[in-house]
Curated annotation (Swiss-Prot):
This is Tripartite motif-containing protein 26. Gene3D superfamilies: 2.60.120.920, Classic Zinc Finger (3.30.160.60), Zinc/RING finger domain, C3HC4 (zinc finger) (3.30.40.10). Residues 379-440 are annotated as: Disordered. Its EC number is 2.3.2.27. GO terms for biological process: host-mediated suppression of symbiont invasion; innate immune response; positive regulation of non-canonical NF-kappaB signal transduction; proteasome-mediated ubiquitin-dependent protein catabolic process; protein K11-linked ubiquitination; suppression of viral release by host.
């Protein structure tokens, strides 16, 4: 049966350090240590005539040995308790199984030799080998190490508490972040659902207007066809009647001379209907509907361009590489602006420099990610203000007249003789303009793009760019594709998706989507500018 910890502690207090058994007839010596009386008689003097205490090495006189009756009584009580616990009297409490014993004497190791750094039992301590050495109790020798361990243990416990605190805070932060993400997910779903509903409603509204126009034109077509057939039949009868009169003999014809003299009065041309296939008001409503479609196209392009820039791309600040700049170009001190000089100004030609083409590359390249920057074109007259003014004036003129609604019937929209007559068509003249040499290009290029000689600067050459000129805007494809944005961009946004293989151009001010190149990139890409336009500047933003 296991012995309780308090009992084991009492047993250690009444154990003789020499015989390692219960104190039998316990006595105390001058230094205060207690041993069995029989054990003290075995203590031999180390030097001189006086024996010394085995524990503290202090000499004592045998005549000063005194019995300790209280300890003797305590030993008896302990033995009685052990009997009550099922142990034989005199049997010591078992030591833990991992308690180390002296390999030589199979005794407990109570001492530590500071000279040899070894654990000693009582017999080893009294041996000739260790008697001259300084030996202290194991507990005393272990005290500094124990303190060191406890200090380090306290440090580790503090670290553990800190880590637990950090972990708890981190878990709370992660939970808060996950909660926020969930809220954002719900917000995104709700916003897009609302947006879908709004667009669906607007779509249905436009489709309803379109259906109304289709119905009006279909009804008008049937009415126009029916009335036209009726008038043709009536006119055919008149023609047949006149043809019959024209075939009459001269005598009979002369008898009708009085009637024929007023032929124009009897058969006036104005009596016959000449109508328009599409009434003026229907044409006007159809034109208004086309304007709405243009507004829809512009709004959707602006929406797409803004989402593309704000949600997916990282805005970067780029500068130009002066060593790649053509001698026809002049760079600003911050390497963000170029102007066209018209004269080659470079004294020496560098290997990485454009010679014939007035181009320049960016100093920063990209091999991954989604990045965005802007290029601003500064030149007098290059703006969309005039076009906006014209559109506003046309809109004001259209709003001045009161017009029928979409719910009116076809016949309500018919007009009088002031409307255009049937068969009248508007003539459109197309003028072929000579190719304008003044232009600029903005986009991206491979860092290995050719720079010597006359270059086409197309995608197959490693350049993906827009060309802007007074005559229009083109995508530098093969062949060139002319583009028709709603507004001429003063600032062009360039969005590069390297992994996605796209270069997208937008109007940075109106957010209108202009054009997208699609390919697979395998080399480092850099910004690309090309300018052959006097009194114009290209500036990198931001």
């Amino acid at each position: 049966m296991a012995v309780s910890a308090p009992l084991r502690s009492l047993e250690e207090e009444v154990t003789c350090s020499i015989c390692l058994d219960y104190l039998r007839d316990p006595v105390t010596i001058d230094c205060g240590h207690v041993f069995c009386r029989s054990c003290t008689s075995d203590i031999r003097p180390i030097s001189g005539n006086r024996p010394v205490c085995p524990l503290c090495k202090k000499p004592f006189k045998k005549e000063n040995i005194r019995p300790v009756w209280q300890l003797a009584s305590l030993v008896e009580n302990i033995e009685r308790l052990k009997v009550d616990n099922g142990k034989q009297p005199g049997e010591l409490a078992r030591e833990p199984q991992d308690m180390k014993l002296c390999e030589r004497h199979q005794e407990k190791l109570h001492y530590y030799c500071e000279d040899d750094g070894k654990l000693l039992c009582v017999m080893c301590r009294e041996s000739r080998e260790h008697r001259p050495h300084t030996a202290v109790l194991v507990e005393k020798a272990a005290l500094p190490h124990r303190e060191k361990i406890l200090n380090h243990l306290n440090t580790l416990r503090r670290d553990r508490d800190k880590i637990q605190g950090f972990q708890a805070k981190g878990e709370a932060d992660i939970l808060a972040a996950l909660t926020k993400l969930q809220e954002q997910r719900q917000y995104i779903v709700a916003e897009f659902k609302q947006g879908h509903q709004f667009l669906k409603k607007r779509e249905q509204h436009l489709l309803d207007q379109l259906a109304t126009l289709e119905q009006l034109l279909t009804e008008g077509r049937e009415k126009f066809k029916t009335r036209g057939v009726s008038e043709l039949d009536r006119l055919t009868l008149v023609i047949s009647e006149l043809e019959g009169k024209a075939r009459q003999p001269a005598a009979e014809l002369m008898q009708l001379s009085d009637r024929l003299s007023c032929l124009s009065l009897r058969y006036p041309r104005k009596k016959f209907w000449i109508g328009k296939a599409i009434p003026h008001m229907v044409k006007r409503k159809a034109g208004e509907f086309s304007d709405k479609l243009l507004s829809l196209q512009r709004g959707l392009r602006q929406f797409q361009g803004k989402l593309l820039r704000d949600l997916e791309y990282k805005t970067v600040s780029v500068t130009l590489d002066p060593q790649s700049a053509s001698g026809y170009l002049q760079l600003s001190e911050d390497w963000k602006c170029i102007t066209y000089t018209g004269q080659y100004q470079s004294d020496c030609l560098l290997p990485q420099q454009f010679d014939c083409e007035p181009g320049v590359l960016g100093s920063k390249g990209f091999t991954w990610g989604k990045v965005y920057w802007e290029v601003e074109l500064e030149r007098e007259g290059w703006s969309e203000d005039e076009e906006e003014g014209e559109e506003e004036e046309e809109g004001e003129e259209e709003e001045e007249d009161e017009e029928p609604g979409y719910g009116d019937r076809y016949e309500d929209w018919e007009t009088d003789e002031e409307d255009e007559s049937l068969g009248e068509e508007e003539e459109e003249e197309e003028e072929e303009e000579e190719e304008v040499q003044e232009s600029c290009m903005v986009g991206v290029a491979k860092d290995s793009v050719k720079r010597k000689g006359n270059l086409s600067l197309r995608p197959e050459d490693g350049v993906w760019a827009l060309r802007l000129s007074p005559s229009g805007i083109w995508a530098n494809t093969s062949p060139e594709a002319q583009l028709f944005p709603v507004l001429r961009p003063r600032r062009v946004g360039i969005a590069l998706d390297y992994e996605g293989g796209t270069v997208t151009f937008t109007n940075a001010e109106s957010q209108e989507l202009i054009y997208t190149f699609t390919t697979t990139f395998t080399r480092r890409l850099v910004p690309f500018l090309w300018l052959k336009w006097p009194e114009a500047r290209l500036l990198l933003r931001p």
